[in-house]
Amino acid sequence: MSGRGKGGKGLGKGGAKRHRKVLRDNIQGITKPAIRRLARRGGVKRISGLIYEETRGVLKIFLENVIRDAVTYTEHARRKTVTAMDVVYALKRQGRTLYGFGG
């Protein structure tokens, strides 16, 4: 392995880091019909127009919390890939146990 440690580049010098596209306003990708379908699944018949932005805000906060915890588990295990189990443990930590994804 030539002393590069776990996951080191094999040949060459490794190359420059590629710039990632800055992600913003992706919450608008949760479309009005998608929110409507979730509400229908929950048994809602009629939806106020103000609900959509509010739902996006609540969903964003919820996902930020879950992802933060999942990434913490990943970093503690010294991995770079977030696994399904990291997400399951993150949800369990917040009192929302999820079944069906191992563990």
From Swiss-Prot:
GO terms for cellular component: chloroplast; cytosol; extracellular region; nucleolus; nucleosome; peroxisome; plant-type vacuole; plasma membrane. SMART domains: H4. InterPro entries: CENP-T/H4_C, Histone-fold, Histone_H4, Histone_H4_CS. Residues 1-14 have a biased composition (Gly residues). Residues 17-21 bind DNA. Gene3D superfamilies: Histone, subunit A (1.10.20.10). GO terms for biological process: response to water deprivation. Keywords: Acetylation, Chromosome, DNA-binding, Nucleosome core, Nucleus. The keyword Hydrolase does not apply. Residues 1-20 are annotated as: Disordered. It holds the Pfam family CENP-T_C. GO terms for molecular function: DNA binding; protein heterodimerization activity; structural constituent of chromatin. The keyword DNA-binding applies. It is found in: Nucleus; Chromosome. May be acetylated by MBD9. Core component of nucleosome. Nucleosomes wrap and compact DNA into chromatin, limiting DNA accessibility to the cellular machineries which require DNA as a template. Histones thereby play a central role in transcription regulation, DNA repair, DNA replication and chromosomal stability. DNA accessibility is regulated via a complex set of post-translational modifications of histones, also called histone code, and nucleosome remodeling. Belongs to the histone H4 family. The nucleosome is a histone octamer containing two molecules each of H2A, H2B, H3 and H4 assembled in one H3-H4 heterotetramer and two H2A-H2B heterodimers. The octamer wraps approximately 147 bp of DNA. Interacts with ORTH2. Interacts with AHL27. This is Histone H4. The lineage of its organism: Eukaryota, Viridiplantae, Streptophyta, Embryophyta, Tracheophyta.
